[in-house]
């Protein structure tokens, strides 16, 4: 059941869930199943970021059989298909309707503070106040676009974040520099190149797992090799960019292929001065790092197949890599943007957290990040959901957030049980 902001009035709920993306919908399902009164507050529409903060040609990064909640399949799509973004958003709407999730849209949460008179919280919204015993921050990992302070905002070149990009037609005529070569950057660069644009792609450190290998998708390999359930990231991998895509039916990202398509590859974007953008001499090293990751996955997969006596077709050609792109061997260290005809810089540089509305002592670190264990905050009664590595590698993904939501609902139920215990005491002589 979805209602709009004008229907809001002062109320009390046991739980307020902030955000109605995949995390908020999953949280609502488990709270509903536990019989816990709650409301989900969403500033826009259900799964809004899928609709308005992603480019038009975006598809899910995993196949339909995997990137979903357990009890509802994607209707009308092959299990191995990569579902378009609008259909993903529609999926969450349908899922919420399936169990009549108490979602209220068009409501902006302004602040959450501790009540002065009891152990609960006061939630200030754009339409009034709500008292809650527990608050779940389910605003996800994509909160505040992060643009490095490299190019001043007042230069003549047009600058935008990937969250504001929708299609090539919205950009000024001319070449485009895409900064960032993760899933978003490589897909947007390919989208622009397909439209006939001159495209430059600044490539930093990254992993690039195979899309498919020996008849199985990357998500399957991550599962059987135990990587989805890693509780902590490997050393140095906390913020590694992952270049994987469902674009064009799903192909392994290889920067050699992008170069062959006419995209000019560059190293890490480092500095800007007087119309000149400079790049680090690290492109060859960054591509080599990605290749090493790619080959390591193939090796682990081959070993798993042998150990488990699986009948999966050999794929020796997957181990053969082509020569380094010419820009890696003879790197371009600087570009005069005007002379190169570059009129747009598109920053595919990720997101920062934004919990400026959560004003509860102990809930956040000094850096403004969640202070928690498996989503249970250091501040009693506050919970976090949808963040990368919340409990495991899969925590920020559709299926992973569903399992984390179940855990948090269980924790809330446990706290309710303790707090409802009346108890008795008697003196023993």
Feature locations, PLM:
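Flavin (primarily FAD) cofactor-binding/catalytic cores of flavoenzymes
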Residues: 2-49, 82-429
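N-terminal glycine-rich dinucleotide-binding loop that anchors FAD/FMN and/or NAD(P) in oxidoreductases
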Residues: 53-78, 217-234
